[in-house]
Amino acid sequence: TINQLEYIEDKNFIKLINLKLSKNYKIKEIQELQLNYNTVNKINNNILLIKNKKKYILSSKSFDGINLIKSLTDTSSKANFFDIFDNLSNVIILEIDKTHLSKSNYLKQLNGDLKIENNKIVNASILAKYSEKDKFFFNVKNSNNGEKITTLYSDRAKPFVKNFKFIKGFEKGVLEFQSIKKNNTSKSVLKIDNF
């Protein structure tokens, strides 16, 4: 257990309170985490994670989501961000003012929640906007018959399709993605309209 730790280097700052690690050095629990640093993409990450009973609240003025988008669109990757935890089973409430998806595209007012069980997202409901007319949403739901349904909609396709090598010329379109997974078999549909 680490009761409190602060690290400051130039403009970079890390602070954590009440961090409990497993024998395998995975996070069992954390009460508070503050991060303020510049990423390799030269974007300031300003993040506050606070545990409130059985929920975590993740708030941020600025969040670099570029690598997150790359990991979500890399179908060959088996990596899971939540694997840094030792059996995370909590709700994470998201309140992010500005989420960078690329150097020139970002979401405003990203809000929602993730329900995590055993380090996996079982339910999610996230809304954001690029502008007053351009929207974004991401949902994950589990049906009663064992299907995991993932839906992503973006009025701007560019931040997502630029990571797919087989898609060229669709940057201006609207992106709709749906995946239904059952018994380790997945069926996915990707639509790009109005390009």
Feature-to-residue mapping (PLM):
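Membrane-proximal interfacial segments on either side of biological membranes
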Residues: 1-195
